[in-house]
Each structure stands twice: as structure tokens, then as C-alpha cells.
């Protein structure tokens, strides 16, 4: 972190305290002594509640505890309403500290009658420590939360639409499954080395070579491999529907002839390794199922337009869209960058200004990870971003700064594409990918039935600008007709999908012709909420 010292002529630091203007106006209108503040500190079982006026004068001398059940929450509403009538309160605002998910039933109950504002735990901590250093109790927390609401630190949180809520749950379940599978593979690598030392190093991509895994699982030791001839290994692989070149098998047997001795618990390690293989296969099936659902949700939102960017695939676009949420929640692209924390921390005091610290903490880590995953793909597969990155490396930029700058740049591009529902004219789109083709190929390769895939493509076509529909349909037809086998789509499935293309093209063209400009502008995601699970 560099320190810049000057004569006070540097960039000034703005005071960024934001006051809740609407709340202050309501207080001025009726008076602070007639405006109530209810603060709630929730836990897993109970909610601690305290009530004051806007000047901080207690209405309840002591806090009250309510179990988080339906009946007790109704009692809490009645008690609060009675206190408002007894003390002549004309208005009330509720402050609830965010606690994962435990505060949600309380929030749903209270917001049916009063305005609810959320308080970040960091705010409670910062307002608690100066007044009560070294003391952390429910009562001290409630006092700090009361000061937070009065000072204007309560936030109005928008609830995600049901579509985005389900989409986000599916994406996070997939990420968790991928992480568990990754850790299991790392453990399996070590166990494999325990009973077959050095075998895993014979293959560059062990987990992408089913025949190598089958040999290790079936034989389980170098001595058994050495006692088996090459023809027998070939026949056993063929019986399992697998194949391996004879030179590779000979290389495996050569390793077995000179392999180190296994650990004393080699047989047990082999059994545990086989059990972990079953878990990895199960997680793989779960991940595939989640990715099918991601495809369905992506097709129903404008985020599907991001598939036109080389380097952005269905999974990364789906993860990005689920974490960003409705694009209408953002006034400008910098709001996405700020929510993800894609800017450096800063320390400034007098003439000392450390403006290039690490990325700020306390932001949405899931959104940041989704953006960074796309950045890694863009560096590998997008010519524009490859050149942009290489030029900065030549100028001596650190890789961290390059990645953050690329993430900011991508968020700006994505915002214009999604918010404007257009195929943005940008150098990174000089070799634009066909959106409908990329979506259809991914769906077919992941086992979604051809007819369901065509329904998804039809929904995705409704997100395209009218001027791009014709060229997208042509690219879809040409792409499926000349699709290489390396894409992973079975030949029979591909033929069935090609037979459905004429009816799909007619359906989309008819929808585009019958859709006027006003109808197109009013097109929303809501009509498709109920069909997502069916399409998935």
C-alpha cells in the first residue's frame, strides 16, 4: 500500500453520510415524541424487542422477549399496537438487524403493519463499541440499533422476485456441489497415491479419463496389474464400454513393474476411495441437474443476451444473472461494482493518502466471485480482453489490478446489454457468438429433451432485439446442421432437434410479427414464472 504525501492539494475526500430524508420529513411533521422506533434483535429461537421514541426516550423501560412462532409473533404485534395507542404515537418505524435468515419471519410479520428497515451487523458493532466497550449483550445491541435507526442507518431492502429467488437458490446449490466435488477429488488423489503410488501422475487429466479410474478401482494395486496381461485389460475395459490405447496400457504396466510399495492401509484406502468415487458421480449428476435448471432460468431473463460475448457460457451467465438480480434495481453500472466491492480500500488522514489498498471487504462475495469467474474466462477465450490484459501486463500492472479493472469493464458492458436489451456494439463483440445456438447446444449436451430445448430457445428469442432475431435464427439453423461431435450432443438427439427447427422458426417469426412495439416494451418476466420448473 503506497503512501502519497503532498501539500494538501490532492483529491478531496467527500463526506458520504446519507440521511434518510423521507424518515426525517415524517418526524418533523408529527414531532419526534410522537414517532416511535421499534428495534428487534433476533436469534434462532427468540426475538428481543425494545421501543423508544425518535428522541431515544424509552417507551418500554425494559426489552421484551418473544419466541419466534406464529402465535407469539401475533402477540408481539398486538403488544406494539397497544403501546402505540397508550403513548399517543402517530407513526412507527421498525429496525431489524440482519442475521442470516433468522430475522425473516419477524420481518414478514412486522412489515404487514409498519415500515421495516434493516440494520447491518457492522453498524450495530460500530455504534455499540464506543458506548459500551468490551460489553456485548442483547440490551446493549438494542441501544446501538436504536441509535442506528435515529441516525439514518436503516436500509430499505427490496425483496427479489420469485423468479430470481429460485434462480439464486439453484445457482448457489450448484456452487456448493462443485466445491464439495472439488474437495473430494483432492482427497481421492491422496488416497490413490496411498495404495497405487505414482499412478495418478501417468495421466494429465485423470478425472477426464474414465478408463484410468476403472483400472485403479478394479485392480487396486501394482502387483495385480503386473499379473494381468494387456489383452485382458483391454477386454475388461471393453466390457465396461471404455477403451484405452495399448501403448497407454503398456505404460501403466511399466509403472507397475517399478512402483513403490503401498501404504500399510492400502486395501482400506482403496475401499474408501471407491466409496468417494460413488459420491463424486452422485455430485456430478446433481451438478448436471442444477445446470439444466440454470439454463431454463437464464432463457427467461435478459441476461441470456450475455451469451453473445465470447468467453461467457451458460453457467457463468446464469450465475452472474442470479447474483445480480433484476437489472432495474441498478441506476448505473457502478452500482453493480459497488455491491460487489470491485474497488480498492483507502486510508486517508491529513497528508497521508493510501488509495490503492486491497479490495474492500464486507461486500457481496457471491456476486464478486461470479464476476471474477467470467473475467478468468474472458482472459482465456476473448481476443479483446486478452489483448487488453496483455497490454496492461506489459505496462507493469499487477494481475490483481488487471482482474479488477476487467471486472469493472465487464459490468459496464453487461449493464448496457441487459438493461437496454440489445446486442451491445463493443470491440469484445467483434466475433459475436450466436445467442440461441449457444443456448441450444448447451441444453442438448446436458440432456434436456429436444422439444423442451426448442421451448427454451423460443423464450430466449423473446429477449432479443427485433433486429437480431432473423440473423440469430439463421445462425441457429446453420450451427445445428454443422455441429461437430466434440460439442457432446448425441447424433440422434441432434437429428431430432434439427427436425423441430422449422416449426420453431415459424413460431418465433409469427410471435415477432404479431408483437407490436408497445407490446414488446411491456414484455416482462412475470408470465413465465410458473413455467420454469416445467422447462427445467
What are the language-model segments listed below?
Residues 1-536:
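A detector of single, family-specific signature residues
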Amino acid at each position: 500500500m503506497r503512501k502519497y504525501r503532498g501539500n494538501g492539494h490532492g483529491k478531496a475526500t467527500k463526506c458520504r453520510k446519507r440521511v434518510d430524508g423521507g424518515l426525517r420529513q415524517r418526524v418533523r411533521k408529527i414531532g419526534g415524541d410522537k414517532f416511535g422506533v421499534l428495534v428487534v434483535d433476533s436469534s434462532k429461537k427468540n426475538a428481543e424487542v425494545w421501543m423508544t421514541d425518535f428522541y431515544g426516550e424509552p417507551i418500554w423501560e425494559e426489552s421484551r422477549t418473544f419466541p419466534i412462532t406464529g402465535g407469539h409473533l401475533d402477540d408481539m404485534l398486538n403488544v406494539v399496537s397497544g403501546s402505540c395507542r397508550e403513548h399517543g404515537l402517530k407513526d412507527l418505524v421498525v429496525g431489524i438487524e440482519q442475521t442470516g435468515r433468522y430475522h425473516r419471519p419477524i420481518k414478514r410479520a412486522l412489515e404487514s403493519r409498519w415500515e421495516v428497515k434493516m440494520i447491518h451487523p457492522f453498524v450495530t458493532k460500530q455504534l455499540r463499541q464506543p458506548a459500551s466497550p468490551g460489553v456485548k449483550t442483547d440490551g446493549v445491541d438494542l441501544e446501538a440499533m436504536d441509535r442506528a435507526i435515529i441516525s439514518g442507518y436503516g436500509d430499505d431492502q427490496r425483496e427479489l422476485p420469485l423468479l430470481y429467488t429460485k434462480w439464486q437458490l439453484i445457482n448457489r446449490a450448484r456452487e456448493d456441489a462443485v466445491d464439495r466435488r472439488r474437495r473430494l477429488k483432492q482427497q481421492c488423489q491422496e488416497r490413490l497415491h496411498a495404495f497405487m503410488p505414482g499412478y495418478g501422475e501417468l495421466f494429465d487429466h485423470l478425472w477426464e479419463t474414465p478408463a484410468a479410474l476403472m483400472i485403479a478401482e478394479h485392480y487396486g494395486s501394482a502387483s495385480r496389474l503386473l499379473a494381468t496381461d494387456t489383452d485382458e485389460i483391454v477386454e475388461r475395459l471393453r466390457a465396461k464400454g471404455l477403451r484405452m490405447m495399448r501403448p497407454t496400457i503398456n505404460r501403466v504396466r511399466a509403472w507397475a513393474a517399478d512402483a513403490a510399495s503401498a501404504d500399510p492401509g492400502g486395501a482400506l484406502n482403496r475401499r474408501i476411495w471407491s466409496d468417494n468415487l460413488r459420491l463424486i458421480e452422485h455430485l456430478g449428476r446433481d451438478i448436471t441437474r442444477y445446470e439444466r435448471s440454470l439454463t431454463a432460468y437464464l432463457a427467461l431473463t435478459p441476461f441470456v443476451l450475455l451469451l453473445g460475448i465470447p468467453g461467457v457460457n451458460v453457467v457463468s451467465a446464469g450465475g452472474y444473472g442470479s447474483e445480480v438480480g433484476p437489472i432495474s434495481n441498478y441506476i448505473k453500472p457502478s452500482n453493480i461494482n459497488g455491491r460487489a466491492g470491485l474497488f480498492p480500500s483507502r486510508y486517508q488522514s491529513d497528508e497521508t493518502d493510501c488509495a490503492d489498498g486491497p479490495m474492500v471487504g464486507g461486500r457481496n462475495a457471491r456476486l464478486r466471485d461470479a464476476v471474477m469467474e467470467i473475467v478468468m474466462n474472458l482472459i482465456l477465450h476473448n481476443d479483446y480482453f486478452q489483448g487488453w490484459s496483455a497490454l496492461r501486463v506489459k505496462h507493469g500492472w499487477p494481475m490483481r489490478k488487471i482482474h479488477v479493472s476487467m471486472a469493472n469493464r465487464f459490468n459496464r458492458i453487461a449493464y448496457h446489454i441487459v438493461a437496454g436489451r440489445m446486442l451491445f456494439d463493443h470491440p469484445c463483440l467483434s466475433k459475436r457468438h450466436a445467442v440461441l445456438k449457444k443456448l441450444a447446444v448447451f441444453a442438448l449436451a446436458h440432456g434436456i429433451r429436444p422439444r423442451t430445448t426448442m421451448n427454451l430457445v423460443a423464450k430466449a428469442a423473446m429477449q432479443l432485439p427485433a433486429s437480431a432475431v432473423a440473423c440469430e435464427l439463421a445462425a441457429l439453423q446453420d450451427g445445428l446442421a454443422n455441429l461437430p461431435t466434440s460439442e457432446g450432443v448425441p447424433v440422434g438427439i441432434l437429428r431430432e432437434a434439427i427436425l423441430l427447427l422449422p416449426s420453431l422458426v415459424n413460431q418465433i417469426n409469427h410471435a415477432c410479427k404479431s408483437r407490436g412495439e408497445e407490446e414488446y416494451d411491456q414484455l416482462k418476466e412475470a408470465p413465465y414464472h410458473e413455467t420454469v420448473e416445467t422447462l427445467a
